Amino acid sequence: MGYDVHCYCFQDSPRRAHSIAAQGGINAAKNYRNDGDSVFRLFMDTQKGGDFRAREANVYRLAECSTGIIDQAVAQGVPFAREYGGMLANRSFGGVLVQRTFYCRGETGQQLLLGANSSLAEQISNGAVKMHTRAEVMDFVVADGRTRGIVYRDLVTGEVRSEAADAVVLATGGYSNVYFLSTNAKGCNVTAIWRAYRRGAAMANPNFVQIHPTCIPAAGDHQAKLT
């Protein structure tokens, strides 16, 4: 596309992202089961699952894009489970009314991450992306209300450097470790998001963070923290 893209990764490889721990699958309104599924039905299921607290426009857009995401993942080589006839398999997952979950056994997140990483590696090989591993973003360069670069630390040498940019995209994932109990990796914290917020980035609904049922104690001193 003509862009000079630099990717900065806190870990020693993008494959260390916590997405590798996801298991269940992805919901998409492809209606392979011919059971009346549609974008609107996926939208309504998602809204109900969120107790109607989610922003409707965003959820509807998510439902619209769901089928394309599956196609993209397949093109990246993600080995979704298939029926004997070769069609992608579906199962019911997460309280939905129809079978619309696409999955890779119990390792969907790992396979999606491998597919995305393979595409990234291809772009790196083509010279379209330059990868910087073991680099922690310390601050953002802001000029005239727009982000124009980053300040980062090389975690191997300890050297602090800066990089100018026309645009900065944060892809830090969740930050479930702001809660007392979490099954997420310790790197899933609010550090990068807080640094962007401190520099003026807009932030909304910080309470919408997934808490895995594994971390809900039956009783004890910390139960009130999860209500």
Predicted segments, located by residue:
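Residues forming the flavin
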Residues: M1-L42, R82, R105-T227
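Residue-level detector of functional hotspots within protein domains
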Residues: Q11-D12, E64, V74, M87, ...
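Short secondary-structure transition/capping motifs
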Residues: R15, D51, R55-L62, T101, ...
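Gly-rich Lys/Arg/Thr-decorated short loops/hinges at beta-loop-alpha junctions or inter-strand turns
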Residues: Q23-G24, G50-R53, S92-T101, T172-G174
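Rossmann-like flavin
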Residues: T46-F93
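Short, charged low-complexity intrinsically disordered segments located at boundaries
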Residues: N58, D71-G77, Q99-C104, R146-G149, ...
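Terminal amphipathic helices with adjacent charged low-complexity linkers/tails
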Residues: A81-L113
